[in-house]
């Protein structure tokens, strides 16, 4: 079992990371993200209620399985326009089995005080043992409580290091030029109104079913994409340009775990949250958007001719560690 507060911290971290990854890989135009402060640093967060709610619901649905310690790793996979995986951002979870044998030995040693004084000191020894036993129990309870509490400062420092590392893989999210462009895009977008071309709720889908954002109309969105294609600086800001990228979230369960309670008919240990299967009906409201879980195979999620890049940002509370790394296709 994992600590509940630790699971909440990890869930919030994954949400933030997913937004940052979608931004740096240009899955959606950068102007559709705004800056928010997280872990004392500015991070890009999507302004789409649909996408934000989708990611949030996806992570929330995993919390019971975090608590049961049945999840081995989570990966956000970037797909090209042919639905071929080209890059994965992987979060691998490993738990440390804490034992209390040493503490029990110390308790036993402390409780066996001066048993040779069987006559004259009998009553004194009884009082001494009771006092020592109670004292040791209180100390052990304090130690156990402290061990069960995640080190929040250490966690936040690890989160911050990871976020900065992936943001710096772009041509600098923190550069003055990009900061100006993002601020300018954010201020100009705020004056835009949703009009025709949406689904009645501000949701916009193009012909391939990819859901776009709720604060611009279809004509404005196409103009943004056209500008990104024609202007080199916008292509640089979104490295993948106009490639119609998509993403999926894969959840890998531990080898000893099957199904993890999401669907009793699943036989694979890899599950997939597919954002393209979110409801797109005109009467759908934001509150009805929930993750769609489907089964997938190892082959479907594999990247051919890939290489691994360790990010060397081990995130830990002292008992549970999250290793982070990326897997990239050699030929995209």
UniProtKB/Swiss-Prot annotation:
InterPro entries per UniProt: HORMA_dom, HORMA_dom_sf, Mad2-like
SUPFAM superfamilies in the cross-refs: The spindle assembly checkpoint protein mad2
Basic and acidic residues biased stretches: 230-244
Region described as Disordered: spans on this chain: 181-204, 225-244
Pfam families the UniProt entry points to: HORMA
GO terms under cellular component: nucleus; zeta DNA polymerase complex
PANTHER family in the record: MITOTIC SPINDLE ASSEMBLY CHECKPOINT PROTEIN MAD2, MITOTIC SPINDLE ASSEMBLY CHECKPOINT PROTEIN MAD2B
Role of this protein: Adapter protein able to interact with different proteins and involved in different biological processes.
Protein name per UniProt: Mitotic spindle assembly checkpoint protein MAD2B
Organism: Dictyostelium discoideum
